[in-house]
From Swiss-Prot:
Protein name: Vacuolar protein sorting-associated protein 30
Membrane topology (UniProt): Peripheral membrane protein
Organism the protein comes from: Saccharomyces cerevisiae (strain ATCC 204508 / S288c)
InterPro entries xref list: Atg6/Beclin, Atg6/Beclin_C_sf, Atg6/beclin_CC, Atg6_BARA
Domain of life, per lineage: Eukaryota
Lineage, highest ranks first: Eukaryota, Fungi, Dikarya, Ascomycota, Saccharomycotina
Record's function text: Required for cytoplasm to vacuole transport (Cvt), autophagy, nucleophagy, and mitophagy, as a part of the autophagy-specific VPS34 PI3-kinase complex I. This complex is essential to recruit the ATG8-phosphatidylinositol conjugate and the ATG12-ATG5 conjugate to the pre-autophagosomal structure. Also involved in endosome-to-Golgi retrograde transport as part of the VPS34 PI3-kinase complex II.
UniProt keyword Transport, yes or no: yes
Length: 557
């Protein structure tokens, strides 16, 4: 073991070795009694010094308390008592070993006596039994006792250490000192406790002197001072009563004021709640108004965007040339095309008459559309677009024309089919002019008449622009428009049945390159006519024509 203060190894006092359970309990109980007694003595002495009238400890008890010796001064006998409990305990191994050895000796001797009795009985009954060797039994018993004693001695040392450790732990838990401690540490501890005890005694004496001084001062008060004090107390009592009445009146006034303030507070709280409700209502109305404004602004912005989109769409629609979008005139190799239909045929690439008739039907439909939209009055002609079987009605000019015609039309009108009839016709054999050739010639006449009337319409638009313009810039623009749109000149000259010197008549023969080229020139003039008509139709005569009049060929889309 080690000292719990300086941590140096310790050698236990011989009196602490081999303690029985009863001795250890007595040691622990004495320590607790001494501690409690010392505390009671110190407290009783302090009470006695503070109050002489309190209960006192008899002197006989104090004398007996002073005669109590320290546990180290006790000369305890190291007797191995056999009065322990029947339960085998680790710290009573020595006693149990003695009890066990004694019981075994008694048992051995008892067995020997029993055997002797049995032997005597057997000798008297049988006469043939043998006697045991007593020396061998005693030797075996002695060997067993020695072995058990060695085991008990080795077990007793660890048991004593554990027992003393438990004792020291219990002592440490009951006091403020950690056990075990060495002799030097114990002396230092005793000196420290003595100094603390002396300081406590001095402090107790100081308080006792102060208490006795106060008691002596209280006894020195005379009767006269008491009477003066009594009269003074009476006057003070009257003053206090008056002050009490005054304070009661003031309290009543304050209570009334408090009631008024409570009522005012309730009224103000109600007004506060009302104002908060009004504020919340205003905020709600304002939020609703803001929400409506936001929704209105969104709708307005949406309408503006829709309006701008509609304007843009309208501008796009205005810029769209309905004639160009509806009638797409282009070319495909040596052939001129209208809406993808080839107008013409050559031996190297034969085009069926159905496709040629359909292209001519589209051409008649285009001319009829221009006449209708621009309100062109063709007095001597009437277009009848009927697809691949379109016709032209021509007014009869003289009787010769009427006599040569085989059609008995009502009135003075001659109906000319603008399609090639593949049925047998006698005129084809003699290479004479057919009604199909006459219809193509009439088509050239109609295009020339439309060109003349469009030039007249453009001139009238130019004169109206000049009269309505007020500033110089607009007049200049009008002059430019007049120069550019008043006169329509087609790229290829048309004269009777020829266009640019090429005849449009077949005279019953099959289409050839010359006729195909003439049809190409025809569609080119019609495309120019279409562009000019688009400008007039859109009322935008200040814009330049969509087709360059210097270009005399059909450009592809």
């Amino acid at each position: 073991m080690k000292c719990q203060t300086c941590h140096l190894p310790l050698q236990l006092d011989p009196s602490l070795e081999g303690l029985s359970l009863t001795q250890r309990n007595l040691l622990l109980s004495n320590n607790s009694i001494i501690t409690a007694t010392n505390e009671n003595v110190i407290s009783n002495k302090g009470i006695e010094a503070a109050d002489n009238c309190g209960p006192q400890i008899p002197k006989e008890r104090l004398r007996r308390l002073g005669e109590i010796q320290n546990i180290k001064d006790l000369n305890l006998k190291d007797d191995k008592l056999i009065t322990d409990s029947f339960v085998f305990l680790n710290h009573d191994d020595d006693d149990n070993a003695n009890i066990t050895s004694n019981s075994r000796e008694d048992q051995r001797y008892g067995n020997a006596n029993g055997n002797d009795n049995k032997k005597a009985n057997s000798d008297t009954s049988d006469g043939t039994s043998t006697f045991r060797d007593h020396d061998e039994e005693e030797q075996e018993a002695t060997d067993e006792d020695e072995n058990q004693q060695i085991q008990l001695n080795s077990k007793t040392l660890s048991t004593q250490v554990n027992a003393m450790t438990n004792v020291f732990n219990i002592l440490s838990s009951q006091t403020n000192i950690d056990f075990p401690i060495c002799q030097d540490c114990c002396n230092i501890l005793i000196n420290r406790l003595k100094s603390e005890y002396d300081d406590a005694i001095k402090e107790r004496d100081t308080y006792a002197q102060f208490l006795s001084k106060l008691e002596s001062q209280n006894k020195e008060i005379s009767e006269s001072n008491k009477e003066k004090q009594y009269s003074h107390n009476l006057s003070e009592k009257e003053n206090l009563k008056k002050e009490e009445e005054r304070l009661l009146d003031q309290l009543l006034r304050l209570e009334m004021t408090d009631d008024d303030l409570d009522g005012e507070l309730v009224r103000l709280q109600e007004k506060k709640v009302q104002l908060e409700n009004e504020k919340l209502q205003k905020l709600s109305d304002q939020n609703l108004m803001d929400l409506n404004n936001i929704q209105f602004n969104k709708n307005l912005q949406s309408l503006k965007l829709q309006y701008e989109l509609s304007l843009n769409q309208l501008d796009k629609l205005r810029k769209i040339n309905i004639f160009n979008a509806t009638f797409k005139i282009s070319h495909s190799g040596p052939f001129a095309t209208i809406n993808g239909l080839r107008l013409g045929s050559i031996p190297e690439s034969v085009v069926p008459w159905k496709e040629i008739n359909a292209a001519l039907g589209q051409l008649i439909l285009l001319l009829a559309t221009i006449n209708k939209n621009l309100k062109i009055n063709l007095v001597d002609y009437e277009l009848q677009p009927m697809g691949s079987f379109s016709k032209i009605k021509k007014r009869m000019v003289n009787s010769v024309e009427y006599n040569n015609s085989t059609t008995n039309a009502p009135g003075d009108w001659l109906i000319l089919p603008v399609y090639y009839d593949e049925n047998f016709n006698l005129g084809r054999i003699f290479r004479k002019e057919t009604k199909f050739d006459k219809s193509l010639e009439t088509t050239l006449e109609i295009i020339s008449e439309i060109t003349r009337q469009l030039s007249t319409i453009a001139s009238s638009y130019s004169s109206q622009t000049l009269t309505t313009s007020q500033d110089e810039s607009s007049m200049n623009n009008a002059n430019d428009v007049e120069n550019s749109t008043s006169i329509l000149e087609l790229p290829y000259i048309m004269n009777k049945d020829k266009i640019n010197g090429l005849s449009v008549k077949l005279h019953g023969s099959s289409p050839n390159l010359e006729w195909t080229t003439a049809m190409k020139f025809l569609l080119t003039n019609v495309k120019w006519l279409l562009a000019f008509s688009s400008n007039l139709l859109s009322k935008s005569i200040t814009l330049s024509p969509t087709v360059n009049y210097n270009d005399k060929t059909i450009s592809g889309n």
